């Protein structure tokens, strides 16, 4: 499997790093990373890693200004793309087909080729413009996976929350996260079922 990972300047850099770390442990997945200029700044602000450290997690790291990169062409076959975190600027550009950098161009290619595109939008609160852009992309078949925490799994650390979001992103491609803590139903519901068998 070949996956493109785009990281933009929205807050949420730990999500992108954790995704790349998880994919690094999957020998059957080849990763192509594109970090925008502001993604690199955000990585160094929000994580203990440098942009170079993060680039080393991917099999291939592309210059965000290189419109001649392999992933800018539909003839270069991939299984899809994840933009994590996805800024509202990037999301709006993808909706409009405005590919001013490699993140936008790669997403545009994935869309036109009918491949899987997953966006992890990071903004709060959301304006009507943001919501309309997300709705339009959803109608095009784009998966919107906002990084909303779950509490049924009783997260104890920020990493627990990050791993849950990454697991839900990987679910979109049928990939299993080793730290996923999945919903098992309510204990009383299971007891009720057993008592009434």
From Swiss-Prot:
Residues that coordinate or bind FMN: 9-11, 36, 87-90, 122
Keywords: Aromatic hydrocarbons catabolism, Detoxification, Flavoprotein, FMN, Prenyltransferase, Transferase
Top-rank taxon: Bacteria
Protein name, as recorded: Probable UbiX-like flavin prenyltransferase
Quaternary structure (record): Homododecamer.
UniProt function note: Involved in the non-oxidative decarboxylation and detoxification of phenolic derivatives under both aerobic and anaerobic conditions. Flavin prenyltransferase that catalyzes the synthesis of the prenylated FMN cofactor (prenyl-FMN) for phenolic acid decarboxylase.
Enzyme Commission number: 2.5.1.129
Catalytic reaction equation(s): dimethylallyl phosphate + FMNH2 = prenylated FMNH2 + phosphate
NCBIfam families: PRK06029.1, ubiX_pad, VdcB
Family as reported in the entry's similarity comment: Belongs to the UbiX/PAD1 family. YclB subfamily.
UniProt cross-references to SUPFAM superfamilies, sorted A to Z: Homo-oligomeric flavin-containing Cys decarboxylases, HFCD (SSF52507)
Any GO BP: catabolic process
Molecular function per GO: carboxy-lyase activity; flavin prenyltransferase activity
Misc. remarks from the entry: It is not known, if phenolic acid decarboxylase forms a complex composed of EdcB, EdcC and EdcD. The term subunit is often used in reference to the operon, however there is no experimental evidence to prove the existence of the complex.
Pfam families, A to Z: Flavoprotein
InterPro entries xref list: Flavin_trans-like (IPR036551), Flavoprotein (IPR003382), UbiX-like (IPR004507), UbiX_pad_YclB (IPR032901)
